[in-house]
């Protein structure tokens, strides 16, 4: 598995409740841009329309060697999942306080571009502060243990 991009801010801003791997409907120049890691998914989110999942604000830069048939960087892309997974996710989207955001884009062992999406719940400010405290404490513990050895 080759990781192309990771949305680390999503793990900081949200509690991840459930994760899914989904395929994406892409054109050739988008796949080539993904291989060059020219993607930004900081503001991306997933919406349901007509029992299909669509990802919005996923910026895949234009492939510089493509001609006039190049793709639009911010176009809405369809996600490919099993029907029962789509029903579960769509039901969770309708629950207030829950959202679906992308966590990472990767190429699987067969070389197919996939996206890991998650059902998330927003963190409060004090939860974020607690996460920062624990992260800093883990970092400090590792520094102390390296000095003692």
Curated annotation (Swiss-Prot):
Q: Where is the signal peptide?
A: none
Gene3D superfamilies assigned: 2.40.280.10
Name one process (GO BP) from the record. trans-translation
The record lists the lineage as:
Bacteria, Pseudomonadati, Pseudomonadota, Alphaproteobacteria, Rickettsiales
Query: What keywords would UniProt list here?
Result: Cytoplasm, RNA-binding
Recorded protein name is SsrA-binding protein
Q: Which domain of life is it from?
A: Bacteria
Main subcellular localisation: cytoplasm
Cellular compartments per GO CC: cytosol
| Protein purpose | Required for rescue of stalled ribosomes mediated by trans-translation. Binds to transfer-messenger RNA (tmRNA), required for stable association of tmRNA with ribosomes. tmRNA and SmpB together mimic tRNA shape, replacing the anticodon stem-loop with SmpB. tmRNA is encoded by the ssrA gene; the 2 termini fold to resemble tRNA(Ala) and it encodes a 'tag peptide', a short internal open reading frame. During trans-translation Ala-aminoacylated tmRNA acts like a tRNA, entering the A-site of stalled ribosomes, displacing the stalled mRNA.
Please list the disulfide bridges: none
Family annotation (SUPFAM superfamilies): Small protein B (SmpB)
Parts forming coiled coils = none
Q: Give the family per the record.
A: Belongs to the SmpB family.
Where does it localize?
Answer: Cytoplasm
Q: Which GO terms describe its molecular function?
A: RNA binding
Record carries keyword RNA-binding: yes
- Organism field: Anaplasma marginale (strain St. Maries)
């Amino acid at each position: 598995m080759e990781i192309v991009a990771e949305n680390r801010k999503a793990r900081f801003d949200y509690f991840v409740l459930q994760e899914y791997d989904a395929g994406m409907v892409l054109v050739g120049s988008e796949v080539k841009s993904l291989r060059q890691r020219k993607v930004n998914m900081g503001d991306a989110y997933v919406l349901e329309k007509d029992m299909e999942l669509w990802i919005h604000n996923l910026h895949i830069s234009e492939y510089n060697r493509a001609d006039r048939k190049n793709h639009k960087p911010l176009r809405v892309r369809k996600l490919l999942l099993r029907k029962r997974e789509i029903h579960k996710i769509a039901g969770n989207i309708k629950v207030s306080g829950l959202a679906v955001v992308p966590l990472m884009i990767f190429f699987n062992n067969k070389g197919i571009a996939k996206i890991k999406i998650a059902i998330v719940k927003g963190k409060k400010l004090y939860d974020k502060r607690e996460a920062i405290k624990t992260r800093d404490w883990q970092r400090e513990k590792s520094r102390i243990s390296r000095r003692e050895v």
